[in-house]
Curated annotation (Swiss-Prot):
Keyword Hydrolase: yes
Protein name: Endochitinase 4
EC number: 3.2.1.14
Keywords: Carbohydrate metabolism, Chitin degradation, Chitin-binding, Glycosidase, Hydrolase, Plant defense, Polysaccharide degradation
GO molecular-function term, one example from the UniProt record: endochitinase activity
Function: Defense against chitin-containing fungal and bacterial pathogens.
Amino acid sequence: MTPQGNKPSCHDVITNAWRPTATDSAAGRAPGYGVITNIINGGLDC
């Protein structure tokens, strides 16, 4: 439920409270399941 480092909160992503920054958009990060997977796995598996 709490953001950690450069990762947003899963709760914020699920509830549409998270809005991607210009850096997020440039990296292809958009609200949805893929971002949640990267948050949980730390981006190691994706």
